[in-house]
């Protein structure tokens, strides 16, 4: 009898451990994403080569600005999106513009990066109205990218991992909160220079 109870408990625990995960509530469609300011580290791997940098990212609709910095804090470049399109400013002050951040990234680095969706995916949501698939492990597939996300106990993003087969991007968030600016900008700061 003792062995029967032990075997039953083991079978029950094994069965529970193998129940399929309910992914229905993962990656809900995007609605209004609140403003935020974040800092962290960024790693990009392409064709066996990797690059690392720090980032600070401010999302205040309609403006989104991502600064890429060296580990010592020098700015390597800035990407900004607003209603007028996207622009990038390199460390030498050269300005590049395009209709979208995706097109701008294709022009500058040769890859269409899904920059215009990062704030949605970082919030744990999918782009509403666009085709998607949620894999059994909870990974989102959208726009040709697999998107994984980890969060802290309060639901704030800790890591965001993107992969399209050729390019792997990993953002590790060390701080996330509200922007310090009290006024919401209407345009990218680089447009007003």
Swiss-Prot record:
Keywords: Cell outer membrane, Chaperone, Lipoprotein, Membrane, Palmitate, Protein transport, Signal, Transport. It is a lipid-anchor. It comes from the Bacteria. A lipid is attached at residue 16 (S-diacylglycerol cysteine). InterPro entries: LolA/LolB/LppX, OM_lipoprot_LolB. It is found in: Cell outer membrane. GO terms for biological process: lipoprotein localization to outer membrane; protein transport. Residues 1-15 form the signal peptide. SUPFAM superfamilies: Prokaryotic lipoproteins and lipoprotein localization factors (SSF89392). One of its GO terms (cellular component) is cell outer membrane. It holds the Pfam family LolB. The keyword Transport applies. A lipid is attached at residue 16 (N-palmitoyl cysteine). CDD domains: LolB (cd16326). Monomer. Belongs to the LolB family. Plays a critical role in the incorporation of lipoproteins in the outer membrane after they are released by the LolA protein. This is Outer-membrane lipoprotein LolB. The lineage of its organism: Bacteria, Pseudomonadati, Pseudomonadota, Betaproteobacteria, Neisseriales.
């Amino acid at each position: 009898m003792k062995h029967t109870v032990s075997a039953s408990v083991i079978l029950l625990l094994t069965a529970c451990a193998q129940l399929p995960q309910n992914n229905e509530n993962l990656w809900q469609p995007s609605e209004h994403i609140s403003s935020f300011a974040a800092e962290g580290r960024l790693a990009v791997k392409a064709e066996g080569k990797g690059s690392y940098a720090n980032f600070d990212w401010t999302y205040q609709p309609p403006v989104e600005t991502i600064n890429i910095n060296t580990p010592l804090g020098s700015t390597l470049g800035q990407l900004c999106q607003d209603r007028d399109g996207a622009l990038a400013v390199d460390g030498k002050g050269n300005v590049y513009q395009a209709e979208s951040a995706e097109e701008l990234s294709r022009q500058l680095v040769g890859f269409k990066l899904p920059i215009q969706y990062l704030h949605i995916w970082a919030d744990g949501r999918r782009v509403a109205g666009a085709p998607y698939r949620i894999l059994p492990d909870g990974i989102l597939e959208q726009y040709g990218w697999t998107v994984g996300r980890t969060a802290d106990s309060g639901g704030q993003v800790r890591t965001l991992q993107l992969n399209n087969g050729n390019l792997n991007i990993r953002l590790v968030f060390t701080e996330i909160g509200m922007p310090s600016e009290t006024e919401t900008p209407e345009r990218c700061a680089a447009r007003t220079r």
